[in-house]
Structure formats: structure tokens, C-alpha cells
């Protein structure tokens, strides 16, 4: 969303949740990283979570301080193409699941579990779509 930060054209939020964190607006920047990217591959193979931390820190350095100065909370919601989620993202998803549970009169654990399952299905669908669109053309004799 543009124009969230005065005198800036940056877009720190894919999703803006009003008054979500201690009464402050929360800017959620959803990002998916491929840990097999050539510039990340070696470190990712040696250090679990390296790609997630890399993209989280990159997003934070780009938007975090500006959001704080504007009185907002910034959360880079970082996912790996293989299904890993940055620890702060896991905490956010659990909090979101508990909020849904309260509003629907369900058990917290049930809503949190369903939310993670839905995210997992979306990731698998996205990966399958990428694979199917990259398959080589088959020449029929």
C-alpha cells in the first residue's frame, strides 16, 4: 500500500491491519524466498533458516524504521518455497489463528492448526503451478 508513510513512495504493507498490535496499525509484508537461489545456496545448505533470515532482515532494513517513525508496527512475513516460516511469522500466524478462534467460538489449537494447513496447501498449489508452467514442450512424432 502506497502513502502509508508520509513523504515516501515505499510500499511496506501487502496487508494493513488497523490497531492490531497494541493498538497500532500493523504493516504485513508477505515475501517468499527460494533458498536454492544461487546467491543463497551455499549459506542455506550450511545454515538452516539462512534464506529466511536474509529476506526478513532485508525487508526490515528497507521498511522497519520508517514504519516505526510513522507509529506503525512492521512485520515481514517470510516464507521459504519449501515450507519454512520465519519464527516471527510463526508467532504472527498463531496470534492470528487465536483471534479467529475467539471470533468463531472455536478452540485456539484447532484454528491455528487449520490456518497452518491452509497455508501449506497454498504453498503446494503454488509450487505445482510453477512446475507445470516450466515443463518442457513435448514433441509428438
What are these regions (language model features)?
Residues 1-13, 21-26, 32-141:
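Non-catalytic C-terminal interaction segments of nucleic acid-processing enzymes
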Amino acid at each position: 500500500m502506497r502513502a502509508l508513510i508520509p513523504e515516501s513512495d515505499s510500499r511496506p504493507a501487502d496487508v494493513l491491519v488497523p490497531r492490531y498490535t497494541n493498538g497500532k496499525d500493523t504493516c504485513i509484508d508477505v515475501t517468499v524466498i527460494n533458498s536454492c537461489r544461487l546467491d543463497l545456496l551455499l549459506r542455506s545448505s550450511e545454515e538452516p533458516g539462512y534464506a529466511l533470515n536474509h529476506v526478513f532482515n532485508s525487508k526490515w532494513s528497507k521498511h522497519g524504521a520508517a514504519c516505526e517513525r510513522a507509529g506503525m508496527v512492521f512485520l515481514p512475513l517470510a516464507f521459504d518455497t519449501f515450507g519454512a516460516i520465519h519464527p516471527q511469522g510463526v508467532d504472527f500466524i498463531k496470534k492470528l489463528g487465536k483471534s479467529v478462534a475467539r471470533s468463531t467460538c472455536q478452540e485456539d489449537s484447532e484454528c491455528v492448526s487449520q490456518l497452518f494447513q491452509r497455508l501449506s496447501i497454498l504453498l503446494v498449489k503454488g509450487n505445482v503451478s510453477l512446475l507445470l508452467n516450466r515443463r518442457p514442450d513435448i514433441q509428438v512424432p
